[in-house]
Amino acid sequence: MKPRHKRALIIIAALIAIGVAALLILNALNSNIALYVTPSEVAAGKAPQGQAFRIGGMVKDGSLKRDGLTVHFVITDLAKDIPVAYIGILPDLFKEGKGAVIQGRMNANGEFIASEVLAKHDENYMPPEAKHALDQAQKNGSAK
């Protein structure tokens, strides 16, 4: 085989390898993306179907119920409520009436099955998306 043909085969093989690597990276990134939605968007059917996503809002007062390691509570944006089930130990800062972001999937019964629970870590901090969603929900709730 001539050196020119060898070089061409090496270049073609390298391009194919780079293409396969790029596809694998994009696939991995796509499967790790968790979209952020509000309880109102979930109730309106705007949540992603069949994939994990995040819900942000406030933990509704009086909704926290523990059954062994399973915890049931309600996340709200002050306009709509979504029931949540989580198996595991909650973060220390997780409390009723405080902000939280929950990652997981909806089940067929309309309950959000959480795989991860993040609690608001500072008295004054709230993610911009959650603050905007709560402000919108308050405006919509007071307009009715």
From Swiss-Prot:
The keyword Cytoplasm does not apply. Heme binds at H121, Y125. It comes from the Bacteria. The chain crosses the membrane at residues 8-28. Residues 29-144 are periplasmic. Residues 1-7 are cytoplasmic. The keyword Cell inner membrane applies. It is found in: Cell inner membrane. Pfam families: CcmE (PF03100). One of its GO terms (biological process) is cytochrome complex assembly. GO terms for cellular component: plasma membrane. One of its GO terms (molecular function) is metal ion binding. Its main location: membrane. Keywords: Cell inner membrane, Cell membrane, Cytochrome c-type biogenesis, Heme, Iron, Membrane, Metal-binding, Signal-anchor, Transmembrane, Transmembrane helix. It is a single-pass type II membrane protein. Belongs to the CcmE/CycJ family. Heme chaperone required for the biogenesis of c-type cytochromes. Transiently binds heme delivered by CcmC and transfers the heme to apo-cytochromes in a process facilitated by CcmF and CcmH. This is Cytochrome c-type biogenesis protein CcmE. The gene is ccmE.
